[in-house]
Amino acid sequence: MKTELSLLDRSLNLQRYPKRAQELLQAWDAGDEYIIKYVEEELNLEDGKNILILNDNFGALSCWFSDKHNVTMMTDSFVSQRGTLKNLQRNQCNRVQLITSTEEMPQGFDLVLMQIPKNNRMLTWQLQQLRQSMDSSCPIIAVNKAKEIHSSTLELFEDYLGETKTSLAWKKHRLVFSNANASNPKTIAEAVCWSVDNEDIDLLNYPNVYSGEKLDQGARFMLEHIPSDPELRHIIDLGCGNGVLSVKAGQLNPEARITCVDESFMAVESARRNLEVNLGKERQFQFIANNCLDGFKKHSSYLVLCNPPFHQGQAITDHIAWQMFCDAKHILCKDGKLLVIGNRHLDYDGKLCRLFGEENVTTVASNSKFVILEAVKAEKSK
């Protein structure tokens, strides 16, 4: 896979995070290149400008513009943040301020660059924050694949931010130009709250959390099959999202210590709030933004709950699920269990059989769309 971004007589060595031996995906896309070309060739910025970059996937924009400008990068992704840091170090770039989506959006910028997020609610929230934080004279330039920029996308920019126009397509990407000058902008609440039908669970979701306004079908199915066992002293919810599986696990296992892990900072904060509200602040909880289970101790958990994502940013991939399964096996105690839910077509059973052994993988439940699998760590497993 290509790792050298060469553009305008400059080059950067950019790699995805975590680094894999046989990486199939590139650490930047044509959208990054389009923004770089436009800013360098059309804006003629003086050195030392203050630039805010939103949703930089693996730091291509941050690395490029930190050469001559003061860059702040804001993201909801732990993986993107860590990947950006690694690429900054790899290319010996100037210091970039890295902040998370759960922090207040800073002010005082001369230019804002944005990779448009996949989640429309996250986009709307970021546009509202830009409208409230940026001066009307500050150019805001966003990018996405042309096929993903619809009239409804531009309406969001107009409604929540200000006057908006688009560029011609280049390498199947399009730029969106806007300013924070809407005279009467629409507003959106930071969080959505609702109660889970037929469960004693109240949930709050911050903008970038999956299934923002209702419980997704997979999670609902999984709730019916979370075990209750006094031997489950430590339960990990891997890819926790809003923490609904952790809440149910905590209700069924009141003595268990629960750890919620997700790569989304907003997901981790949603889970923190939801466990404290539904289970009480006095319980033993841990909330970690992380790349899967990096840094977790071996043989430290009795049950891992997992609802793996099959995309990373805009890219569809199954390597995240595989890493989750490998990490879960590593940290499970002997006879510990990994409980996984996924769409039937994703072949998680094949992956789990390869990893845990066919005799240690069983189907707990299935319906027309989902399957729940249990993998047990046998005594001989490492």
UniProtKB/Swiss-Prot annotation:
Specifically methylates the guanine in position 1835 (m2G1835) of 23S rRNA. The keyword Repeat does not apply. It comes from the Bacteria. Belongs to the methyltransferase superfamily. RlmG family. Its main location: cytoplasm. InterPro entries: rRNA_m2G-MeTrfase_RlmG, RsmC/RlmG, SAM-dependent_MTases_sf, Small_mtfrase_dom. Keywords: Cytoplasm, Methyltransferase, rRNA processing, S-adenosyl-L-methionine, Transferase. This is Ribosomal RNA large subunit methyltransferase G. It is found in: Cytoplasm. It catalyses: guanosine(1835) in 23S rRNA + S-adenosyl-L-methionine = N(2)-methylguanosine(1835) in 23S rRNA + S-adenosyl-L-homocysteine + H(+). The keyword Cytoplasm applies. It is an enzyme of class 2 (transferase). CDD domains: AdoMet_MTases. One of its GO terms (molecular function) is 23S rRNA (guanine(1835)-N(2))-methyltransferase activity. Pfam families: MTS (PF05175). GO terms for cellular component: cytoplasm. Its EC number is 2.1.1.174. It comes from Aliivibrio fischeri (strain MJ11) (Vibrio fischeri). HAMAP family: 23SrRNA_methyltr_G.
